[in-house]
Amino acid sequence: LFRNSVEPEVLIFFRQTMAQNLTIRLARSTDYDQILKLSEGIYDGHDYLPPRYHTWMAMENLHVMLAFSGNKLASLVACSIIDEGKTVVTRAGRTSPEFCGQGIFKLLQQAIVDFSLKRYPIIQQWRLVTVFSPEMLDNSYENVDEQDSLTCMVLSSTKRPPSFSFNLDSLEIQPCTKEYVCDVIFQKEEEKLFPGKVIQADRFPIEPSLSNINYLMQENDSLHFAVEKCVHDGCRPRSFSLGVRSQYVKFVNWCVTIYSDDPQLYQAHLVHQFKRSCEEIESEFSFVCCHDKKFTKNGIEVLQEFLSLKSDEDIKLRKAYVYEQ
């Protein structure tokens, strides 16, 4: 079991690790300037940690841990306690280039997991998102979800194409409430839409539940839920999308995750979420679409059309794997 995989000798919270002259402790609000310096240049401005840091400091069930070498900040990792306290998710990990390759991040990650197990004794599993495919990890990690993501920049409202050419009137997508999502989508359609029982919200892996949606609302600007319009009583939704709007270092970011097995419904959700993001955000922004890999080619074609791109080189493809231990 995950609990039994924790080695007692790695419990180093709040004490020096003499072998590497490290000090590991929880972050404070006053560490912000050092964290900004550690985060300089990460993800080319697509980094969410600095804008969220003070919000995170005020949130329950969220902790940031730091590793110092002397008085230099060497590494950082955060964790969220979600799924009604059953899961710890590690996030926002980073290490200074000066200290890369020394095993510091692995030590820090183990420290924050150990801290979480002691503080939240009902934790049953550790979950993380990474770009590493299953063959790159050992057998102790269970691959529970994987998605492709497409990222592109959208110009400010005054420079955008005047209209959209896709005609998908027969597949109308409509917004829905948090209550509908939690009472209908999560309760009645979970097995069909989320076979791994995990959804990725801006690449943050959570179980589909009301408590986790409320958690998301604490740290993001807004959430936009959408389903296809039902045409008769008793109609059951075959698709769902979640758009997350948040502030990154250089840009506002809109990340949509689409769940459906139908290519037309996938495209309809992408159109709907893209239009909604353009309505809400007037400045230049980053648009990210996450989905099953079978829809990647279709997604690239749609975004090329929207943004009048002559090449798909301006659309960045990335894979994300969710593991549990």
Where is each model-derived feature located?
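Conserved acetyl-CoA-binding loop-helix of GNAT-fold acetyltransferases
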Residues: T95-P97, G101-S116, Q264-S277
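Conserved catalytic-core motifs of GNAT/GCN5-like acyltransferases
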Residues: I81, V129, N143-F166, E305-Q325
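Conserved GNAT acetyl-CoA-binding A-motif
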Residues: V88, Q109, F115-S133, I281-K293
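Conserved acetyl-CoA binding element of GNAT-fold acetyltransferases
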Residues: K86-P97, Y248-D262
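Glycine-rich phosphate/pyrophosphate-binding loop shared by adenosine-nucleotide-utilizing enzymes
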Residues: L22, N71-L76, V88, V231-L242, ...
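Active-site rim helix/loop that mediates acceptor-substrate recognition in acyltransferases
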Residues: D33, S39-A78, I185-R236
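Short amphipathic alpha-helix that is part of the acyltransferase structural core
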Residues: T17-P51, E146-C152, K159-L210
